[in-house]
């Protein structure tokens, strides 16, 4: 750093310190470094996008006015994320080298998130198997498990692993044709191809790749033309010994309205699940996030978050950021008491009534003046069958139980019966106002304390 620039910045910091609380200064300003100064602009590095956003919204004028107080000139302040600087330097230094090919051509512009690598993935008991399977596929594409099918709830790391596979393969072979796409984008591109009479172009795009990663594959269920097209794409790639990686929120056998021929192909390779992280993994995730974002958070605060937020990684990390922001806005240190205040609304929602299949059966049978035994019986009269279907629908929506387990709890029924009930109620809800009211009433009884 230029000596004059350092001197200017040190004097500026003294002024800013006098204007802010110690907590706010340490949280938002201390980690900043001046990069360069021109005739009108001062560029300042910041550790992450969250800090950049806060500085832009709340502290830019303070920084500009503090600098003006030192040198009698008003500069335009530009906050730049440090990682972006490194990326630009790496691109510049390797400009004569062959750049990473993460797409087949410009039209297929699918981006792998640079943050989602194996190195940044936190391994725990809940995801160890899925991580090991993903790494095995990345090390030996189309030789280990093909396809690899990763499933689990929202925000548990499925997308992270898929991007990590793509990065790992490209690091070893920059010329590999790696394509990552959501099932929604795949469907939309197919629709456009049909509309514009470009079917052949669409097929060439997805069948001439080395690695195809499709996220949230469950959303092609019910879309006949998309399933037809993907069936042939799958066959073409598999026959050519190309790697296919799919993710979903549930295993293939539990995806309703998925064609059997696709279901069987999804089960050809390896199916790996990701569960909700345990306490130790949640703590490790929070510590990793704090390190990456350059946040100073005590272990007891992270322990509090890990104890209260158990559902998924996104909510865990979101809770940490919320606490840091709350600390800055209230000019208070990050403590367990402050964390309790910052998360009280979130936690109160999380601590609502725990919904189980037994509870659903009790509430539904009471609502329709039936006995729980009726819902479990083999009776098929409408006054019993329809409430039973509603109870199965709610069991699928409000619990984490698998379809076979739900069927078992309703008199030992097959999982296909549960799928039928779920699909029927889902479809009827679109047009039946009375059913909507019934389901809403029962849901309130189930979820409210």
UniProtKB/Swiss-Prot annotation:
Gene3D superfamilies: 1.10.1750.10, 1.10.8.60, 3.30.300.180, P-loop containing nucleotide triphosphate hydrolases (3.40.50.300)
Region (Domain III, AAA+ region) location: 111-327
Localization (cell): Cytoplasm
Region (Domain IV, binds dsDNA): 328-449
GO biological process, one term: regulation of DNA replication
Keyword Hydrolase among UniProt keywords: no
Residue segments, region Domain I, interacts with DnaA modulators: 1-73
An example Gene Ontology molecular-function term: ATP binding
GO cellular component assignments: cytoplasm; plasma membrane
Pfam families linked: Bac_DnaA (PF00308), Bac_DnaA_C (PF08299), DnaA_N (PF11638)
Domain notes: Domain I is involved in oligomerization and binding regulators, domain II is flexibile and of varying length in different bacteria, domain III forms the AAA+ region, while domain IV binds dsDNA.
Family indicated by similarity: Belongs to the DnaA family.
Function: Plays an essential role in the initiation and regulation of chromosomal replication. ATP-DnaA binds to the origin of replication (oriC) to initiate formation of the DNA replication initiation complex once per cell cycle. Binds the DnaA box (a 9 base pair repeat at the origin) and separates the double-stranded (ds)DNA. Forms a right-handed helical filament on oriC DNA; dsDNA binds to the exterior of the filament while single-stranded (ss)DNA is stabiized in the filament's interior.
PANTHER family linked to this entry: CHROMOSOMAL REPLICATION INITIATOR PROTEIN DNAA
Record text on subunit structure and interactions: Oligomerizes as a right-handed, spiral filament on DNA at oriC.
Protein name: Chromosomal replication initiator protein DnaA
Species name: Clostridium beijerinckii (strain ATCC 51743 / NCIMB 8052) (Clostridium acetobutylicum)
